[in-house]
Amino acid sequence: DTNKIVPDGPTISTNFGEKAQNRTYQDLLKNKFDEHNFEQLSTSTIYKVSIDGSVKKWMDDGMYRTISFSPNGEYVMISQIKKPFSYLVTYSRFPTETNIYTKDGDFVSNLLNVPLIEELPKGFMSVRTGKRSFNWRPDKGASLTYVIALDSGDPSNKVDFRDEVYELNYPFSGQGKSILKTINRFSGIDWGTKNMAIAYDTWWNTRNRKSYAVSYTHLTLPTKALV
């Protein structure tokens, strides 16, 4: 009932004296009516369609953001948008919840709960703290990698390494195993043969980008830059 979401007063923003930068975005949510429309348009239900054409409800209604199956097809990583919404930033910084399920839809573990992000340190290379960038390793059946900022997400902090990459296996809980640290902001890994991978980092301020050869048998900071 949209009549129940008609504002009964002004929209109020509060600043608590903290330093933060926010870009100016167009077409943000502005009121409860916008929130209602956003939720209606972003909510969906996941169904499983078998080869024989049969259709079965697989996951309840939710504001699903990403769905990614493990390479062996046994597990699926699902991220959902959660409330509260924001009138200051785009939906990419709304709260999210990321969980692992079996291929049959059974819950396995909660990977991540990211709160609303309205404030970040100044700079294009700023990131939020905590675990981020969960991805399946394509060279393994069901192994995840994720990244943690070692500079508190603030590019103005002087540190030896900006990011640390971890590997996380079943049951997909806890810290996992550290496999790599990068001097600049980590931007990805191409998993190659059984003994070699190519890792990348980047730094926008200097337009610097490095590619490194990484040995699977000794996953520490690579010292040989390819380019």
PLM segments and residue spans:
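Single conserved hydrophobic/aromatic residue that forms the stacking wall/gate
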Residues: 218-227
